[in-house]
C-alpha cells in the first residue's frame, strides 16, 4: 500500500499523508479526492512516502483519482515547491492559486462542452421561458455550468431542449505550433540586429539580456527578428506585461506581421476562457502568449523565449502574503528551462543594473550615442503659495492657461492624502480627530476601529458623539465627495473627469481603444498615480503632480527609485508629444537634491548616485534584508511573537560570530491595504545564505511555542 503526501487548498504550512488503495495509480502533480474532517476536498499529490511499518499508522484512504497525468509541468512544479520553501508560504495556497477555477474542483480537463437545440417552441406562452431557451441555444455550456442553472433539468424533462452536440477542449480546430507559420508582412534586418539575435540564440542556454535606451524603430525590428527565429524552431514565446492595456497594444502589433495563434491572459477573463487557454498552452496549440502576472506559471509544452516588458514596474510585485516578484520568477523559469530572457525597460530597476555590473545580465545596445531627452518641469514651493484643495495659485493659473489653448490637463493626486473614510455625526457634523496631530481619524465601512495614519494610533470606534451625546455616528467618504465639490467650485464651466477607480473597467469590453482617453478638447482629468498608468492620454500637454513629498520622507528606502521611474515614464502616458509636454511638481521641500537635478540629469546618472549611496550605507542590493510581518486579533501577541524571533536570532548570530541588525518590532500598515495594521521586524545581514539558514532554524524553534498558533505571519524577502 502506497502512502502519498498531499497538499490541500488551506493556509497551512504542511502537507497531509493518506493511504492510496492498490487499485489506484497516483501521479505526482495530479489531483485526487481525499476526506478532510467531515467533507471531501480536492488535493494535489506532492510525493510518495516510503515507510516499512504501516500497521501503526492511522491514516485516511484516498477516495478517487481525478487526473491521469500531472496538471503542472516539471519546471512549474519545482518552482512552486521552491517558492513555498524560500518565502515560507503555505504550500497548498501556492499550488491552488495558479490553477484555473474549474481545476480547483472535481472537474476533468477534457470536460464536455454542450450546445442545445429548441424543441416544441410554439407551445409555450411564457415570455421568460422563451428568452431562457434562446439563451441556451446561443451559448455553449461546460458540464459544470449545467449544475449552476437549475432550469436545465426542467427543460430537458419537458422536452423543451435537446443536447445537439458536444465538443472537447482538446479537439478544437486550432493550428498547431508545429505547423508552418506564415508571415503577413516581410521585414528586413540590418547586420547589427542579426548579429545580436544570433548571439542570444546561438548558445542554446540560459542568458539574461537588458534592452534599454534604444531607438523605438530598431527595438521593434529586433523583437520581430527574435520572434521569427523562435517560431522557425517551433518554440513558444511568453511576453509578460504589467497592465492589460499593454496586452492589446502588443497583440495589435504582432497580428500585423505574424499569422500564428496568439493567446492573451489577464485577470478579467472568464473562467471558461481561462481554462481553454491554459489547456491550449499545455498541449502546445498556441505560439505566443501575452499576459500579466499569472501567465508566468502556465504549463508550456516547449517554451523557447521569455520577454518581460517594463521589468522595473511595481505591478509585477505580488502584494499578497507570498511577496514574490514575477520578474524574478520569469528569470528562474528561464534558468530552469535553459532558455534566454529579455528584460525591457527605459528605466530599469537598480537590481537589474546591479546584475549588469556583476555580469549576471548582459546589456543590448544598437546605437553608441543616443541624445537624451529631458522633460520640461517646474517645481512649485507650496510654502510660498496660497493653496486651495491641495492646488497652489500658480498651478491653478497654469491650468486655466492650458484650457484657454483648448488642451486637456492631467492632475495626478496622492491617493492616501485625499481619499479616506471618516466618522461624522449626522446631527452636529463633528468629525473625529486625533488628539496628537489634530488630523482626521480614518476607518473602514465595516471596521470597529479608528486609526491615525500619522501617529499609528488605533482606538475603538465610539458608540455616540462626544459633542452632542447622540447615537448618530456614520461612516462618510470624505475624499471623493470633497474633491468633486471643491473642483467644481474652482473650475465651474470646465469639464471634469474623475478616474479614481478601476471597478468600471470590468463591466466593459476590453479593447485597445478603451484604454485611450479620446477627448482632445479642454478638460481636466483627475486621477491617482496608480490608476493613471492604466490609460493613455494622447492629447494631454500638461501634467501636474500635486504632492510628491511622501516619496522623499517615506520609511522605505526604495521610494526615491520608484518616484524616478514614475517620473521618467510619464512620457509613455502621452504618446508622441515629447517636446510639447510640460510637468509641474508641487512640494514643500523644493531644495531636495533629487528634485533640483531632475531637469538636467538622466535616469542612469541618478541610478549611479543611488547605488553608491546604498553601497555606502550597506543597503540592498549590496546587502540583504528580510521583513517579518505578524498580525493577530490581540496586538500584544503579534508583538511578543516577533520579540521571540528577535531573541532567537540574536543568540544564534552571537554563537556564529555574525553581525545581524534589527529594526523593530513596531506597528506598520500593509502595502496592499493601508487600513490594515501589522507589526514588523526588519532583519539585515551581509550574507544571503547565512540569513536563509538562520531564519529556517529560528522559525522551526518558534513553531514549538503556543504563541505561533495565535498569530498570522509571513516574510518579505529580497526588498528592492
Swiss-Prot record:
Matching Gene3D superfamilies: P-loop containing nucleotide triphosphate hydrolases (3.40.50.300), PriA, 3(prime) DNA-binding domain (3.40.1440.60)
Short motif DEAH box, span: 309-312
GO cellular component, one term: primosome complex
Coiled coil: none
Alphabetically ordered keywords of this record: ATP-binding, DNA replication, DNA-binding, Helicase, Hydrolase, Isomerase, Metal-binding, Nucleotide-binding, Primosome, Zinc
Function: Initiates the restart of stalled replication forks, which reloads the replicative helicase on sites other than the origin of replication. Recognizes and binds to abandoned replication forks and remodels them to uncover a helicase loading site. Promotes assembly of the primosome at these replication forks.
Record HAMAP family: PriA
Protein family (similarity comment): Belongs to the helicase family. PriA subfamily.
Protein name as annotated: Replication restart protein PriA
Lineage of source species: Bacteria, Pseudomonadati, Pseudomonadota, Gammaproteobacteria, Enterobacterales
Gene name in the database record: priA
Amino acid at each position: 500500500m502506497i502512502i502519498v503526501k498531499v497538499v490541500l487548498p488551506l493556509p497551512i504550512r504542511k502537507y497531509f499523508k493518506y493511504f492510496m488503495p492498490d487499485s489506484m495509480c497516483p501521479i505526482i502533480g495530479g489531483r485526487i479526492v481525499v476526506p478532510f474532517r467531515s467533507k471531501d476536498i480536492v488535493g494535489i499529490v506532492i510525493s510518495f512516502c516510503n515507510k516499512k511499518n504501516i500497521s501503526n499508522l492511522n491514516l485516511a484512504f484516498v477516495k478517487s483519482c481525478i487526473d491521469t497525468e500531472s496538471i503542472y509541468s516539471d519546471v512549474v512544479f519545482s518552482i512552486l515547491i521552491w517558492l513555498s520553501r524560500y518565502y515560507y508560504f503555505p504550500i497548498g495556497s501556492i499550488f491552488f492559486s495558479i490553477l484555473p477555477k474549474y481545476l480547483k474542483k472535481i472537474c476533468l480537463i477534457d470536460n464536455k462542452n454542450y450546445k442545445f437545440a429548441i424543441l416544441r417552441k410554439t407551445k409555450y406562452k411564457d415570455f421568460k421561458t422563451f428568452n431562457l431557451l434562446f439563451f441556451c441555444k446561443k451559448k455553449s455550456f461546460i458540464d459544470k455550468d449545467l449544475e449552476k442553472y437549475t432550469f436545465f433539468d426542467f427543460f430537458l424533462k419537458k422536452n423543451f431542449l435537446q443536447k445537439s452536440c458536444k465538443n472537447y477542449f482538446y479537439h478544437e480546430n486550432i493550428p498547431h505550433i508545429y505547423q508552418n507559420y506564415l508571415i503577413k508582412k516581410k521585414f528586413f534586418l540590418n547586420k547589427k540586429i542579426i548579429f545580436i539575435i544570433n548571439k542570444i540564440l546561438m548558445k542554446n542556454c540560459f542568458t539574461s539580456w537588458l534592452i534599454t535606451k534604444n531607438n523605438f524603430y530598431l527595438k521593434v525590428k529586433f523583437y520581430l527578428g527574435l520572434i521569427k527565429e523562435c517560431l522557425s524552431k517551433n518554440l513558444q514565446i511568453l511576453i509578460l506585461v504589467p497592465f492589460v492595456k499593454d496586452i492589446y497594444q502588443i497583440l495589435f502589433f504582432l497580428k500585423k506581421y505574424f499569422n500564428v495563434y496568439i493567446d492573451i491572459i489577464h485577470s478579467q477573463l472568464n473562467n471558461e476562457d481561462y481554462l481553454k487557454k491554459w489547456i491550449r498552452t499545455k498541449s502546445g496549440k498556441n505560439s505566443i502568449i501575452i499576459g500579466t502576472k499569472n501567465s508566468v506559471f502556465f504549463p508550456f509544452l516547449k517554451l523557447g523565449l521569455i520577454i518581460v516588458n517594463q521589468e522595473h514596474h511595481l505591478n509585477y510585485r505580488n502584494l499578497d502574503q507570498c511577496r514574490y516578484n514575477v520578474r524574478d520568477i520569469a528569470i528562474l523559469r528561464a534558468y530552469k528551462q535553459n532558455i534566454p530572457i529579455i528584460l525591457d525597460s527605459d528605466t530599469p530597476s537598480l537590481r537589474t543594473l546591479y546584475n549588469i555590473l556583476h555580469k549576471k545580465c548582459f546589456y543590448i545596445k544598437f546605437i553608441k550615442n543616443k541624445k537624451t531627452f529631458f522633460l520640461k518641469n517646474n517645481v512649485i514651493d507650496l510654502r510660498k503659495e496660497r493653496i486651495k484643495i491641495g492646488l497652489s495659485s500658480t498651478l491653478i493659473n497654469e491650468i486655466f492657461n492650458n484650457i484657454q489653448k483648448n488642451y486637456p490637463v492631467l492632475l495626478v493626486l496622492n491617493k492616501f492624502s485625499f481619499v479616506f473614510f471618516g466618522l461624522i455625526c449626522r446631527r452636529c457634523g463633528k468629525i473625529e480627530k486625533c488628539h496628537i496631530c489634530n488630523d482626521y481619524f480614518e476607518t473602514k465601512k465595516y471596521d470597529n476601529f479608528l486609526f491615525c495614519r500619522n501617529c499609528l494610533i488605533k482606538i475603538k470606534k465610539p458608540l455616540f458623539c462626544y459633542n452632542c451625546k447622540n447615537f448618530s455616528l456614520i461612516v462618510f467618504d470624505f475624499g471623493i465627495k470633497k474633491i468633486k465639490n471643491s473642483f467644481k467650485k474652482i473650475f465651474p464651466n470646465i469639464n471634469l473627469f474623475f478616474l479614481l477607480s478601476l471597478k468600471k473597467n470590468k463591466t466593459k469590453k476590453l479593447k485597445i481603444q478603451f484604454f485611450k482617453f479620446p477627448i482632445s478638447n479642454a478638460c481636466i482629468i483627475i486621477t491617482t498615480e496608480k490608476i493613471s498608468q492604466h490609460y493613455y492620454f494622447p492629447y494631454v500637454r500638461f501634467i501636474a503632480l500635486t504632492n510628491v513629498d511622501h516619496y522623499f520622507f517615506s520609511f522605505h528606502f526604495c521610494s526615491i527609485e520608484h518616484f524616478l521611474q514614475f517620473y521618467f515614464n510619464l512620457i509613455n502616458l502621452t504618446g508622441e508629444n515629447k517636446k510639447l509636454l510640460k510637468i509641474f511638481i508641487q512640494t514643500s521641500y523644493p531644495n531636495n537634491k533629487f528634485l533640483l537635478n531632475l531637469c538636467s540629469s538622466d535616469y542612469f546618472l541618478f541610478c549611479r548616485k543611488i547605488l553608491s549611496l546604498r553601497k555606502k550605507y550597506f543597503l540592498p542590493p549590496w546587502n540583504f534584508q528580510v521583513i517579518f510581518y505578524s498580525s493577530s486579533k490581540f496586538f500584544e501577541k503579534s508583538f511578543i511573537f516577533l520579540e521571540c524571533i528577535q531573541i532567537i536570532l540574536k543568540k544564534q548570530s552571537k554563537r556564529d560570530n555574525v553581525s545581524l541588525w534589527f529594526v523593530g518590532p513596531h506597528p506598520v500598515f500593509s502595502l496592499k491595504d493601508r487600513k490594515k495594521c501589522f507589526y514588523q521586524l526588519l532583519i539585515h545581514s551581509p550574507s544571503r545564505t547565512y540569513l536563509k539558514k538562520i531564519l529556517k532554524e529560528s522559525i522551526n524553534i518558534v513553531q514549538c511555542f503556543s504563541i505561533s498558533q495565535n498569530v498570522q505571519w509571513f516574510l518579505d524577502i529580497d526588498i528592492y
